[in-house]
Each structure stands twice: as structure tokens, then as C-alpha cells.
From Swiss-Prot:
Deamido-NAD(+) binds at residues 139, 172, 179, 259-260. Keywords: ATP-binding, Ligase, Magnesium, Metal-binding, NAD, Nucleotide-binding. This is NH(3)-dependent NAD(+) synthetase. Pathway: Cofactor biosynthesis; NAD(+) biosynthesis; NAD(+) from deamido-NAD(+) (ammonia route): step 1/1. It catalyses: deamido-NAD(+) + NH4(+) + ATP = AMP + diphosphate + NAD(+) + H(+). It comes from Streptococcus thermophilus (strain ATCC BAA-250 / LMG 18311).
């Protein structure tokens, strides 16, 4: 088995999908998890305005609406805006919220918490790089989501999908930390197909993807940071042939990000050797 075949098998990616069927699978998955854990009453997710959180948010809202109708219990979806100061693409985030139609929408600005942490580190002689500060932002957002979930008998939804997981393009214990991943198995173009099926505005899934965590490189596109396009990543995940350069880049990211796909390493683990 080639590395490409191994990765595809591990991430469960299909070469083609039926968007309607995949929507049903994700909604049913979210419903089943909540029913199995009767102490859960809410799902919580941070909404950035990008494709992934927009899709996961809409799926979550559909799931709790169906659960309310079927059980007469007051399940809720809580969407959280988590800007650092003023978000440049706030209009996109508001467009996403209008599409998702969450039961509850909160806005919690993380700037003061992040800047306070960076300032305290500086007092201790630790000068945080812009890149590391970006990771602090991602982790602060997840701290906030878990705080909201903890006060509302909730589970935190993650937006990790196959293209992101393959490249390790997420912050460990930041946006990579969550309870449930309804998009896992889908690549980027498949996620866009689900949003199209759900009737989303094209702007919500044709927008250039960016993590937008670094202040020295505001709005830097994921594809620029990765050195490979999502089209190439998606082709790779669908078992198609890509250029030698793209394959090398993709597989380098896979190896480099292995530690992000595991729980903390124990003496019994050998994947890292």
C-alpha cells in the first residue's frame, strides 16, 4: 500500500460523494452522539466566517432542530464569534451566522485575554513571536468555547476535515481540540459541495481560505502557507495523480503533523520513531 493509499484509508475519504447523503450522515452523527450522552444539552462552535465553521455550524443547527422535534427536549446550538479586536472580514462572519441561524449567538472578544497572556510572558522574559501568538489566539478561542460548553452542558464541535488533517494545518490543542468532528472524511471541495446543497451563498464557500492568525502576515492564504493548493490536496485525497512536487509537499506535511493526530505520546507509542 502506498502512503497515499494509507492516508486516504485513515481519513476515510471517498473519490466522489452524494452531498445530500453526506449531510444526512453528519446530522445523524451529531444527533446520535447527543442522545447517547443524556447529560448533553447543547453544541458549541466558534464561527469565523469561513467555509468549515459555516458548514459545521449549519449541520449542528439542523441536528438540534431535529432533536427538539423528535424528543421535545430543549437542545440548543450556541454559535460564538471570537474576534481578536476588530475582524477584517466581519461581514463574512455575519453572513455565515445569517445562513446558520443558530439558536444562540454570542460574541466574545479574545484580544484582552491574548494580549494579557503575551504581556505576562514578556514580564517573565519570554518574548512571544508573532507565529506563536497566533497559536495562543487559536487556543484562547478553544478555551472560551469550552467555558461556554461547560456552563451549558455542551460539547464542542471541531471543524477538522480531511484536507486540514492531512496537512496538519491546525493548532494543536487550539482549533484541533474538540469533542466531535462532523466534517471528518470530507475534503475541501466536498465540504463546499455540502454547503451548495444546503443553499449557502457562493461567497461562503468560494472565499479564499485563511487561518488569519499572524499579524505580520494578515489574511495569508492557506495555500500560500502550505505551498500547495487545495485542488491538489483534494485530488491527492481522491486517489488521483498529482505532480511530484505537490505529492512531496503534501506527504511532508503529513509526516510533520503526525504528533497532532495523536493523544500525548506514551512509552508504548512508536509512530514517532
Amino acid at each position: 500500500m502506498t502512503l497515499q493509499e494509507t492516508i486516504i484509508a485513515q481519513l476515510g475519504v471517498k473519490p466522489s460523494i452524494n452531498p445530500k447523503e453526506e449531510i444526512r450522515k453528519s446530522v445523524d452523527f451529531l444527533k446520535a452522539y447527543m442522545i447517547k450522552h443524556p447529560f448533553l444539552k447543547t453544541y458549541v462552535l466558534g464561527i469565523s466566517g469561513g467555509q468549515d465553521s459555516t458548514l459545521a455550524g449549519r449541520l449542528a443547527q439542523l441536528a438540534v432542530e431535529e432533536l427538539r422535534a423528535e424528543t421535545e427536549k430543549d437542545y440548543q446550538f450556541i454559535a460564538i464569534r471570537l474576534p481578536y479586536g476588530v475582524q477584517a472580514d466581519e461581514d463574512d462572519a455575519q453572513r455565515a451566522l445569517a445562513f446558520i441561524k443558530p439558536d444562540v449567538s454570542l460574541t466574545i472578544n479574545i484580544k484582552e485575554a491574548v494580549d494579557g497572556q503575551v504581556a505576562e510572558l514578556a514580564k517573565a522574559g519570554v518574548n512571544v513571536s508573532d507565529f506563536n501568538k497566533g497559536n495562543i489566539k487559536a487556543r484562547q478561542r478553544m478555551i472560551t468555547q469550552y467555558a461556554v460548553a461547560g456552563e451549558n452542558s455542551g460539547a464542542v464541535i471541531g471543524t477538522d476535515h480531511a484536507a486540514e488533517n492531512l496537512t496538519g494545518f491546525f493548532t494543536k490543542f487550539g482549533d484541533g481540540g474538540a469533542d466531535i468532528l462532523p466534517l471528518f472524511r470530507l475534503n475541501k471541495r466536498q465540504g463546499a459541495a455540502l454547503l451548495a446543497e444546503l443553499g449557502a451563498d457562493k461567497a461562503l464557500y468560494e472565499k479564499v481560505p485563511t487561518a488569519d492568525l499572524e499579524e505580520d502576515k494578515p489574511g495569508i492564504a492557506d495555500e500560500v502557507a502550505l505551498g500547495v493548493t487545495y485542488h491538489e490536496i483534494d485530488d491527492y485525497l481522491e486517489g488521483k495523480e498529482v505532480s511530484a512536487k505537490a505529492q512531496e509537499t503534501i506527504e511532508t506535511w503529513w509526516r510533520k503533523g503526525q504528533h497532532k493526530r495523536h493523544l500525548p505520546i506514551t512509552i508504548f507509542d512508536d509512530f514517532w520513531k
